[in-house]
């Protein structure tokens, strides 16, 4: 057998694999628009026209066209509850029932199942919690981006991190949520390809869904841990700090530690001074102004500028709120 020369059959195979991956990414991006818009009929039509979805298409046909719903590895009583949510998703995203009508049908079904026909939604939520917790599950109910959907998982693991920040080290606790059974509507519609990565508890603790994160990634270590730890430090150091000021400082910390130039571009794309009630948009607008004269193609320049702005803003905060003792474990 002759050796393959560079650029021969092996290179062709590699090219075909890379091209195939490019097509798959493009297809994923295109079909994601259907899911984001809650258009399951459109998604199914798209899948029928694209060979790369042939393996998953039958699952969509079974649920949405035939009404053959999924059963989960939980007790029957809990499956009965989750079935009502699945019917709500089919009604809303496939059958075209207005969300308000589908929600009314869902809530009526849940009340009947739990034998609380006249319960207000708050009481219904309490009963749902109790039913799942009695079987050893954690649960969160309510709406995500306008649609009902429960989060059901088996284990919550508080994990303490020592987070390096520009002015010292902060201790920050993250709840890692493991063993998910159900992760609301987007996860259900996409069989786990898309979905919520976590949320903040009322006390500010971040809850991270284990399957949604690479815990060695910059997304977790910088955009989540350092961002949220900086919030914690700033709220202790400057009790009167505004949401816009909090976000501005946390974004600067991200930019200082990030190895990705695309992060700055992401913030610039979010800048919008007309959205005065949106702390993220306003913070990004300030960043856009203050990085206008920075070489945005140079990572060291971006990192240095971010640190310079953070220190200047700390001086501004101390003048505004009074100098407090620095919160640091390092």
Residues covered by each model-derived region:
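Long, well-structured alpha-helical subdomains associated
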Residues: 259-330
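Structured segments of extracytoplasmic/periplasmic soluble domains
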Residues: 46, 50, 63, 232, ...
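Short pre-active-site segment immediately N-terminal to the catalytic Zn-binding motif
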Residues: 206-223, 241
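N-terminal maturation segment of proteins
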Residues: 12, 23, 28-58, 165-180, ...
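N-terminal low-structure segments adjacent to metalloprotease catalytic domains
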Residues: 2-138
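Post-HEXXH active-site segment of zinc metalloproteases
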Residues: 217-219, 235-252
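Auxiliary, metal-adjacent structural segments of Zn-dependent hydrolase domains
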Residues: 121-207, 214-215
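Active-site recognition of the HExxH zinc-binding catalytic motif
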Residues: 223-236
């Amino acid at each position: 057998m002759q050796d393959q020369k560079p650029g021969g059959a092996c290179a062709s195979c590699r090219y075909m694999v890379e091209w195939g991956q490019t097509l798959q990414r493009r297809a994923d991006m295109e079909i994601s628009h259907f899911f984001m818009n809650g258009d399951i009929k459109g998604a199914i039509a798209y899948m029928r026209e694209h060979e790369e979805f042939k393996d998953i298409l039958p699952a969509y046909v079974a649920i949405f066209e035939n009404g053959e719903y999924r059963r989960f590895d939980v007790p029957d009583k809990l499956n009965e509850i989750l079935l009502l949510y699945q019917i709500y998703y089919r009604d809303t995203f496939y059958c075209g029932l207005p969300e308000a009508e589908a929600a009314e049908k869902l809530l009526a079904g849940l009340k009947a199942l739990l034998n609380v026909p006249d319960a207000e939604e708050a009481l219904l939520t309490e009963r749902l919690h109790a039913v799942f917790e009695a079987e050893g599950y954690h649960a969160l109910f309510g709406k995500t981006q306008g649609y009902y959907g429960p989060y059901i998982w088996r284990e919550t693991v508080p994990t303490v991190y020592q987070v390096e920040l520009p002015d010292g080290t902060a201790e920050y606790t993250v709840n890692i949520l493991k063993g998910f059974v159900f992760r609301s509507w987007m996860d259900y519609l996409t069989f786990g390809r898309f979905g919520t990565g976590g949320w903040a508890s009322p006390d500010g603790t971040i809850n991270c869904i284990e399957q949604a994160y690479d815990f060695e990634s910059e997304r977790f270590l910088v955009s989540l841990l350092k961002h949220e730890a900086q919030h914690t430090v700033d709220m202790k150091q400057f009790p009167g700090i505004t949401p816009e000021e909090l976000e501005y400082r946390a974004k600067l910390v991200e930019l200082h530690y990030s190895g990705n130039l695309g992060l700055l571009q992401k913030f610039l794309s979010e800048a919008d001074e007309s959205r005065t009630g949106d702390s993220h948009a306003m913070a990004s607008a300030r960043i856009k102004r203050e990085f206008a004269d920075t070489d945005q193609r140079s990572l060291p320049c971006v990192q240095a500028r971010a640190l310079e702005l953070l220190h200047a803003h700390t001086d501004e905060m101390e003048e505004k709120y009074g100098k407090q003792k620095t919160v640091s474990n390092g």
